[in-house]
Amino acid sequence: MNFNLRGAVLANIAGNTQDQLQETIVDAIQSGEEKMLPGLGVLFEVIWKNADENERHDMLETLEQGLKNK
């Protein structure tokens, strides 16, 4: 059986408002459940693909700093 996780995540959130998307992200992070990580990865992929070079640079700086503070 082939299961398209990326497609399922995108179908599940298609048409969501910014508030709904934020709630999804916050809930996934606060739950701390490993099973939520692939969905967050799909959301990050959408952000990354739609970001320009400056936004990508800013995200990478934020990520680098966040990892240094762990």
Curated annotation (Swiss-Prot):
Q: Which UniProt keywords apply?
A: Sporulation
The record's annotation in InterPro entries points to: SspI
Q: Name what induces it.
A: Expressed only in the forespore compartment of sporulating cells.
Where is this chain's protein located in or outside the cell?
Spore core
Q: What is the predominant subcellular site recorded for this chain? A: other
Q: Which domain of life is it from?
A: Bacteria
Query: Biological process (GO) annotations?
Result: asexual sporulation; sporulation resulting in formation of a cellular spore
Q: List the signal peptide residues.
A: none
Keyword Lyase listed: no
Record's HAMAP family? SspI
NCBIfam families per the UniProt record, alphabetical:
SASP_sspI
Family recorded in the similarity comment: Belongs to the SspI family.
Name the chain's protein. Answer: Small, acid-soluble spore protein I
What organism does the record attribute this protein to? Answer: Bacillus cytotoxicus (strain DSM 22905 / CIP 110041 / 391-98 / NVH 391-98)
Q: What is the lineage of its organism?
A: Bacteria, Bacillati, Bacillota, Bacilli, Bacillales
Which gene is transcribed and translated to give this protein? Answer: sspI
